[in-house]
Amino acid sequence: MIKKIGVLTSGGDAPGMNAAIRGVVRAALTEGLEIFGVYDGYLGLYEDRMVQLDRYSVSDMINRGGTFLGSARFPEFREEHIRQVAIENMKKRGLDALVVIGGDGSYMGAKRLTEMGFPCIGLPGTIDNDIKGTDYTIGFFTALGTVVEAIDRLRDTSSSHQRISIVEVMGRYCGDLTLAAAIAGGCEFIVVPEVEFSREDLVNEIKAGIAKGKKHAIVAITEHICDVDELAKYIETETKRETRATVLGHIQRGGSPGPYDRILASRMGAYAIDLLLQGHGGRCVGIQNEKLVHHDIVDAIESMKRPFKGDWLDCAKKLY
């Protein structure tokens, strides 16, 4: 019987994490459970930095960006003896389960704790939208709004100077944020990690646009594909059009979460408590076709596939 649980945020922060913590805390207290917040993710779990939370601990948190519990990278958590210390710290406080809010690295930590006999529930908190078993992650839509606003501003100045603008978007190995922002922002060209990239092909497409009378253009590209400053120099040399690169960086992670992310985070947080009370452990929560679902966290990491949104790219190309 679950009586006490912990909650932590791990990895890169995302708008809506505070709303998710609030959902977990309020739902747990409503069900008569005690709940502890863990500071700075798995590092705080290892260092035994936890605090008991009440309803007032999460007051006025639903609209705040970031995570008030903090987050930290802690690669040492891969070591079994480190995780054993973390489990002992939780048992010392009488915790029966842990809710982990974060990305795929955070899920891996939850998976390993689950395999060591400590039940965890994972909630997808990342702007990258790269988590298996869910259509959308907490923070994705807020980050999308931030990126589109930046693209709109770049379009103003690009059109004024007949310039080609490259905008680098976060996402790591997933192009969802780039794709969605490119469609919403009317970008002329899209480069994502799921599709092989050739700078020569990109230049040819840009030249074709110029031949049709296009006086400016925006290229949306996912981070880590190439050096965007070098790409800008290459495009400018080949097209004789002024080209500038803008790296949006960590601004994409900040800001007050939008309504959808607040709702999604709240629903997922409350659902995590429902799952624990039903006796589930080692699960990760998702939303598919607007319905909350849960999957085995081991299967989600090791077996499940995350489909590429090829139809989004096809749509974008029709609108160039």
UniProtKB/Swiss-Prot annotation:
<dbReference type="GO" id="GO:0061621">
    <property type="term" value="P:canonical glycolysis"/>
</dbReference>
<dbReference type="Pfam" id="PF00365">
    <property type="entry name" value="PFK"/>
</dbReference>
<feature type="binding site" description="in other chain">
    <location>
        <begin position="170"/>
        <end position="172"/>
    </location>
    <ligand>
        <name>substrate</name>
    </ligand>
</feature>
<feature type="binding site">
    <location>
        <position position="12"/>
    </location>
    <ligand>
        <name>ATP</name>
    </ligand>
</feature>
<dbReference type="GO" id="GO:0016208">
    <property type="term" value="F:AMP binding"/>
</dbReference>
<dbReference type="InterPro" id="IPR035966">
    <property type="entry name" value="PKF_sf"/>
</dbReference>
<dbReference type="InterPro" id="IPR000023">
    <property type="entry name" value="Phosphofructokinase_dom"/>
</dbReference>
<keyword id="KW-0808">Transferase</keyword>
<keyword id="KW-0067">ATP-binding</keyword>
<feature type="binding site" description="in other chain">
    <location>
        <begin position="186"/>
        <end position="188"/>
    </location>
    <ligand>
        <name>ADP</name>
    </ligand>
</feature>
<comment type="pathway">
    <text>Carbohydrate degradation; glycolysis; D-glyceraldehyde 3-phosphate and glycerone phosphate from D-glucose: step 3/4.</text>
</comment>
<dbReference type="InterPro" id="IPR022953">
    <property type="entry name" value="ATP_PFK"/>
</dbReference>
<dbReference type="InterPro" id="IPR012828">
    <property type="entry name" value="PFKA_ATP_prok"/>
</dbReference>
<keyword id="KW-0021">Allosteric enzyme</keyword>
<dbReference type="GO" id="GO:0048029">
    <property type="term" value="F:monosaccharide binding"/>
</dbReference>
<dbReference type="InterPro" id="IPR012003">
    <property type="entry name" value="ATP_PFK_prok-type"/>
</dbReference>
<feature type="binding site" description="in other chain">
    <location>
        <position position="223"/>
    </location>
    <ligand>
        <name>substrate</name>
    </ligand>
</feature>
<keyword id="KW-0547">Nucleotide-binding</keyword>
<comment type="function">
    <text>Catalyzes the phosphorylation of D-fructose 6-phosphate to fructose 1,6-bisphosphate by ATP, the first committing step of glycolysis.</text>
</comment>
<keyword id="KW-0418">Kinase</keyword>
<comment type="similarity">
    <text>Belongs to the phosphofructokinase type A (PFKA) family. ATP-dependent PFK group I subfamily. Prokaryotic clade 'B1' sub-subfamily.</text>
</comment>
<dbReference type="GO" id="GO:0005945">
    <property type="term" value="C:6-phosphofructokinase complex"/>
</dbReference>
<dbReference type="GO" id="GO:0046872">
    <property type="term" value="F:metal ion binding"/>
</dbReference>
<feature type="binding site">
    <location>
        <position position="163"/>
    </location>
    <ligand>
        <name>substrate</name>
    </ligand>
</feature>
<feature type="binding site" description="in other chain">
    <location>
        <begin position="126"/>
        <end position="128"/>
    </location>
    <ligand>
        <name>substrate</name>
    </ligand>
</feature>
<feature type="binding site" description="in other chain">
    <location>
        <begin position="214"/>
        <end position="216"/>
    </location>
    <ligand>
        <name>ADP</name>
    </ligand>
</feature>
<keyword id="KW-0324">Glycolysis</keyword>
<feature type="binding site">
    <location>
        <begin position="103"/>
        <end position="106"/>
    </location>
    <ligand>
        <name>ATP</name>
    </ligand>
</feature>
<dbReference type="GO" id="GO:0042802">
    <property type="term" value="F:identical protein binding"/>
</dbReference>
<feature type="binding site">
    <location>
        <begin position="55"/>
        <end position="60"/>
    </location>
    <ligand>
        <name>ADP</name>
    </ligand>
</feature>
<feature type="binding site">
    <location>
        <begin position="73"/>
        <end position="74"/>
    </location>
    <ligand>
        <name>ATP</name>
    </ligand>
</feature>
<dbReference type="GO" id="GO:0003872">
    <property type="term" value="F:6-phosphofructokinase activity"/>
</dbReference>
<feature type="binding site">
    <location>
        <begin position="22"/>
        <end position="26"/>
    </location>
    <ligand>
        <name>ADP</name>
    </ligand>
</feature>
<feature type="binding site" description="in other chain">
    <location>
        <position position="155"/>
    </location>
    <ligand>
        <name>ADP</name>
    </ligand>
</feature>
<feature type="binding site">
    <location>
        <position position="244"/>
    </location>
    <ligand>
        <name>substrate</name>
    </ligand>
</feature>
<keyword id="KW-0963">Cytoplasm</keyword>
<dbReference type="GO" id="GO:0070095">
    <property type="term" value="F:fructose-6-phosphate binding"/>
</dbReference>
<protein>
    <recommendedName>
        <fullName>ATP-dependent 6-phosphofructokinase</fullName>
        <ecNumber>2.7.1.11</ecNumber>
    </recommendedName>
</protein>
<comment type="subunit">
    <text>Homotetramer.</text>
</comment>
<feature type="binding site">
    <location>
        <position position="104"/>
    </location>
    <ligand>
        <name>Mg(2+)</name>
    </ligand>
</feature>
<dbReference type="GO" id="GO:0030388">
    <property type="term" value="P:fructose 1,6-bisphosphate metabolic process"/>
</dbReference>
<dbReference type="InterPro" id="IPR015912">
    <property type="entry name" value="Phosphofructokinase_CS"/>
</dbReference>
